[in-house]
């Protein structure tokens, strides 16, 4: 078992399996018969309690909505107020109270906090003292996909560790296991971040968009079929990045099978125009992260691309 006592803050892109990695670390720390490399055995009493979700020495601090999505909490009753997307100060206080109890099984105790950027300043402040001086044998494993959104006071108390994207082979295997129809295309589209809820989100629409820009299909159909704004904006950003790459003679990252089409589009617009479009999309993506209704409509963005649109004779 690790002797590092500083709270660990694991960070990396969304969809790379960060929550699974935190859960695995908790399992490794709590297992009562780990293997030689320190991995949880999966069948001791502690591992069985963990898989039943009833281990008393593990505490998961998550936003309510995420806890339900990740199977860490039961969905709220019908008619209850919608689950929160933030980690509340009350939830932090419950963790702090729990942290002072003694271990039920006489071993390590683990607090998981994910994502730490879901704590507003008051909630984070309520956690600082416990992070600074955790009770004996308490481990903090925290995670974030947005390290730049983590409060400096919290960040400075943690040991930062970056988590990379899955390797291509592992990403393809994970997609095949989920019966993905076109694992290669999806792995490229999400750049191997296959543990996202929907790694393929926006791909079909992006292909329609690309076809329309290349003179096939109708704009109205594209607008009507647009995914939610947050997905649409990211899809358009990916097309833009690939077009900018094509302009510089580089292979596409997200749409590797469509290099020829991307090269035709890339040539239709000045490089600076592509860059400015990308910047507008990045700003819109930051807004939609906070509020999905951030005044963004697919129509506005499709129009934004309208003058790139190649005539159908091409
Ligand atoms: Zn075990």
Residue ranges and their predicted role:
Residues 1-38, 46-49, 100, 136-139, ...:
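Charged, glycine-rich active-site and insertion segments that engage polyanionic ligands
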Residues 1-122:
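Clamp-loader machinery-focused feature within the broader ASCE/P-loop NTPase space
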Residues 118-119, 133, 149:
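Residues immediately C-terminal
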